[in-house]
Amino acid sequence: MAGLRVIRFPYFLQRWEKLAMHGGGILNKLKSNPLYYLMIPFFLLGQLRAVIGLLRSEKFDLIHAHWLIPQGFIAALSLLITRRKIPLLCTSHGGDLFALKGKGLQRLKRWVMGKSAALTVVSTAMKKTVVDMGVDPEKVEVIPMGVDLKGLFTPDPSVQRKTDELLFVGRLVDVKGLEILLEAMPKVLAKYPGMRLTIAGAGPLERKLRELAGELNITDKVDFLGMTPQDKLPDLYRRATLSVFPFVVTKSGVQEGFGLVVVEAMGCACPVIAGDLPAMNDTIKNGENGLLAPSGKPQALAETIIKLLDDPELRARLAGEGRKSVVQKFDWEVIAGKYAEVYEKIISMKQLE
C-alpha cells in the first residue's frame, strides 16, 4: 500500500516468534501453552527497542498505539525514555480494557491513559468503562472498527441464499460463546431437523467444541471449516439463512468490544442474531436491523433463532435494514474520516502549545 511502511521487530528465535500470530490473540496463546509466558519479556523488550530506535532516528507528528497494553505502555515508556514531545493516541479494542484486571495492571492502564493526548474506543459501552476509570470524557472518542462495505462485504443477488444453514464466523475462543450456540442447536433441530451449523474460524477451543457437538449428538449437523480467508467470507454470509454470534462475558470479565463479524454479515444483507452485550447496542437495534438474544442462555438463543427461521418476511426486513445501517456508520471511508479528524485535532493542539 502506497505510503505505508511496515517494520517488524525480532524478539526471539524466529521459529518461536508465534506469540502474536493467529490462534486467538496473545491472551489465548498464553492459555494454550504456559511456556509462552517466557517470551513476554523478550516481546516487550524487542518492541521497546524498536520504538526507541525509531524515535531517535526519525521525526514523527503523532504516535498511534493500538491496545493500551502492551503497545500503549511501550509507546508511552519510549516517549519518556527518549524525552520526545510527540502526542500519543491510544486505541482500545476491548480485550485490554475488560481483561487484565489486577490492581497493578489497572494502575498501568490508567498511567497509559494519562500519558495519552486522546483515546479512542470501538464502542459506546467501552467509553463508559474508560470514563468510569477516571478519564475525562472529552478525551475519549468512539470510533468503531471499519469494514469494506462497498467493495468486499456487499450483497450479491446472483448468490442463492439457503434456507437451512446457520453461520458463525470468528475465533474459537471463550468470548465468542460458541458453546452456547451448540447447546441451543438440539432445540432448533427439533423443529428444523434439516438445519446445519457452519463454523468458519480456528482457535484453541476447537477440540473442546467438537467434543461438545459429539456429546449433544449433533456432530453430523455441524461443519467446522477452520480458518477461512477474508475474501471467502462474503459468499458464506450471502448463502447463510442467518448468522449467529452468541457473544458472552467470560468468568474473567472479558467480553467483545465491538463484534466486527456482525457488521460483515449485515453488510452482505445476512440476517443477524447476537448476544445482547452492551457493545452490540452500537450496531444492532433489536427488532429493527437484527435481533439480540439473552447472552449465555442456550434456550433463549434457540427460541430467537426459531423465531427468525419461522418468519421469512422478518428475515428480509432485517437484512435490508441491516445493510443500510452499517454502510452509514462502519464503511472504511466513514471510519478513516473520523480518524483523520482526531489526528488533525491532536496535532493542531500540539502546535498551539
Please provide the spans of the model-predicted regions:
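Carbohydrate-associated surface elements
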Residues: 125, 146
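Nucleotide-activated donor-binding/catalytic signature segment of Leloir-type glycosyltransferases, i.e.
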Residues: 207-231
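Acidic donor-binding loop of glycosyltransferase active sites
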Residues: 238-253, 270
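Short hydrophobic beta-strand element within catalytic cores of glycosyltransferases
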Residues: 262, 267, 271-274, 284
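Conserved acidic donor-binding segment of nucleotide-sugar-dependent glycosyltransferases
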Residues: 286-287, 291-298, 307-313
